[in-house]
Structure formats: C-alpha cells, structure tokens
C-alpha cells in the first residue's frame, strides 16, 4: 500500500541544540535506511518550510503508523497521511 505523507517538523525553540543535532542525525540515518529498503519510496523537501512530502510503501495502515512512530523526530512532527491507489491513466508500470 502506498501512503502520501506530509511531515512538518516543529522542534521546541528551547530544545538543547546538541539534542536537536542528534535527533536530526538519527532521523537521517533511519530515513536513508528505510529508503534503501524500499519502504520510504520518495522524499521531497517543501521549499521554504521545515517539512517534506513523502511516499511510503508498506503492507498496511498499521505498518505505515508503526513506521512513522519509530522516527526519532515523530514527537515533534505534525503528520498528515493519505492512502494512494494507482490512477488508471498512469503510464508508469511500477505504480502500486
């Protein structure tokens, strides 16, 4: 199942800079691993915002939820999730 996810990061202004740096490094490491595994299929920065649009390829709604909840920045994110299905006019054979 494919899910379109908008993630907006909202770190507290009084967060210790060292903690913020570590959280971002941990997030990057996990995000890149999930991309290599094929779970996190697409990742785009939203220009001018500390936010991204992503596409996740997981087995279920629960798997999507579990994947998002393991992200180190999860407690500091506003997240919107929409399920996706293949469009009948798409010419791409890898749409699922």
Curated annotation (Swiss-Prot):
Disulfide bonds: none
Catalytic reaction equation(s): (S)-muconolactone = (4,5-dihydro-5-oxofuran-2-yl)-acetate
Annotated EC: 5.3.3.4
Alphabetized InterPro entries for the sequence: Dimeric_a/b-barrel, MLI_dom, Muconolactone_d_Isoase
NCBIfam families with a match to the protein in the record: muco_delta
Family to which the UniProt record says this protein belongs: Belongs to the muconolactone Delta-isomerase family.
Assembly notes: Homodecamer.
Protein name according to UniProt: Muconolactone Delta-isomerase
